[in-house]
Amino acid sequence: MEGEIIAVNGPVIDIYFPDDVPNVYEALELENPVKNEKLVLETRILLGDHRVRAIALGSTDGISRGLKVKRTFHPISVPVSEEVLGRVVNVFGEPIDGGDKIKGEMTPIIKNAVEFRRVEPSYSILETGIKAIDLLTPFPQGGKIGLFGGAGVGKTVLIMELIHNVAVAHGGISVFAGIGERSREGNELWLEMKESGVLSKAVLVFGQMNEPPGVRMRVPLTALTIAEYFRDYLGKDVLLLMDNIFRYVQAGMEVSSMLGRIPSAVGYQPTLITELGEVEERILSTDTGSITAVQAVYVPADDLTDPAPATIFSHLDSTLVLSRSIAEMGIYPAVDPLASSSQILEPKFVGYEHAEVARKVVEILQHYESLKDIISILGVEELSEEDRVIVNRARKIQLFLSQPLFVAAAYTNIPGVYVPREKTIEGFKAIIEGEVDDLPEDAFYMVGTLEDVKKKAQEHGALMY
């Protein structure tokens, strides 16, 4: 079944089919006569009179009116099998790492979420080894987690650290979707995973900044399809990482504009909620396995009320907000403990001790926040004795939330540390109960456990008891 191109407007192509027209989301193929390569289109609008409008998932250089277009009778499909592990692929599941072609069952990337009766809510905790996360925003296995932050506050570094820790500590499978981010960062991630030996348990799916919007909009679905294969057919618990889900929204905005839709609030596409739902509702735990999704979310102008971050918020189980002011203090990961939250930070899920320590930590930090204006005007000396103790402990908590990361070791010259959840709780419990009040503040900066704090204080000549 062939059609003929009747109009080309950048990545938007109109095609006339004399017989049956393709379905919406059906993939179409044509040969680019200039580049001698295949170009895939995706049907988006049925215009009537045997005409359809499609979006090109590749460069349209050399495409002209009159070229023949073939129907495939199915949506974009990718090969899924265990062969995809350790590989870097594009939106079509084709290798871009110079390796052999991947063999596997061709699976459509556009499909419905699993049946409701197969969904199993999971309340077990995914330990990350990162203190700020494990204490204040524990990740539910099989849940959806968002890393919110503006440009340059450390979202990508934190995602790379999570890949490292989950692969090394849990031996789990990771699927990484690079959506509209820098090619350089993708290359760094690939090299980092190669060097740390975790690449064999991971799949990287890239649709970077230089790709057409149609590609950037479909990369998360390709990554999801691969993750679903490992969950449904191999019974695995999969960590799905998306960097950056906001670029998916941006790509949808570009496609929507090209298709002539009237924009919604702040210029976003009118289908924003539907498009995000198509991705988020497929991230589920089932009776066979789970997909835990960690999504980096760029926050335009650090405004969390922007329609894109606000819509993403509604889908999440844990929200991790990265703060520019905390990053400027040199505390990494720059997690804002007062803005971040987790639905499973309750005694019935994490245990009474964990929930109580986390509550007291937040309480102390909130009290410190309320005292900051007084301190800046009058100084710490004018505070009551009780408030001075609170300030002392709050500063130690702030510094103890920092941690040397494995993926940043090359830049900081400080070896990375994985901190078990029990050690994290033990350390913060000691601070809030006043057991380490006489130790200097700088001993709490960029260390792992309480033992490391005492060792650092001893090295600095502090009194130990």
UniProtKB/Swiss-Prot annotation:
SMART domains: AAA. Belongs to the ATPase alpha/beta chains family. This is ATP synthase subunit beta. It is a peripheral membrane protein. SUPFAM superfamilies: C-terminal domain of alpha and beta subunits of F1 ATP synthase (SSF47917), N-terminal domain of alpha and beta subunits of F1 ATP synthase (SSF50615), P-loop containing nucleoside triphosphate hydrolases (SSF52540). It is found in: Cell inner membrane. Keywords: ATP synthesis, ATP-binding, Cell inner membrane, Cell membrane, CF(1), Hydrogen ion transport, Ion transport, Membrane, Nucleotide-binding, Translocase, Transport. Pfam families: ATP-synt_ab (PF00006), ATP-synt_ab_N (PF02874), ATP-synt_VA_C (PF22919). One of its GO terms (cellular component) is plasma membrane. Produces ATP from ADP in the presence of a proton gradient across the membrane. The catalytic sites are hosted primarily by the beta subunits. It comes from the Bacteria. One of its GO terms (molecular function) is ATP hydrolysis activity. Signal peptide: none annotated. Its EC number is 7.1.2.2. Its main location: membrane. F-type ATPases have 2 components, CF(1) - the catalytic core - and CF(0) - the membrane proton channel. CF(1) has five subunits: alpha(3), beta(3), gamma(1), delta(1), epsilon(1). CF(0) has three main subunits: a(1), b(2) and c(9-12). The alpha and beta chains form an alternating ring which encloses part of the gamma chain. CF(1) is attached to CF(0) by a central stalk formed by the gamma and epsilon chains, while a peripheral stalk is formed by the delta and b chains. It catalyses: ATP + H2O + 4 H(+)(in) = ADP + phosphate + 5 H(+)(out). ATP binds at G149, G150, A151, G152, V153, G154, K155, T156.
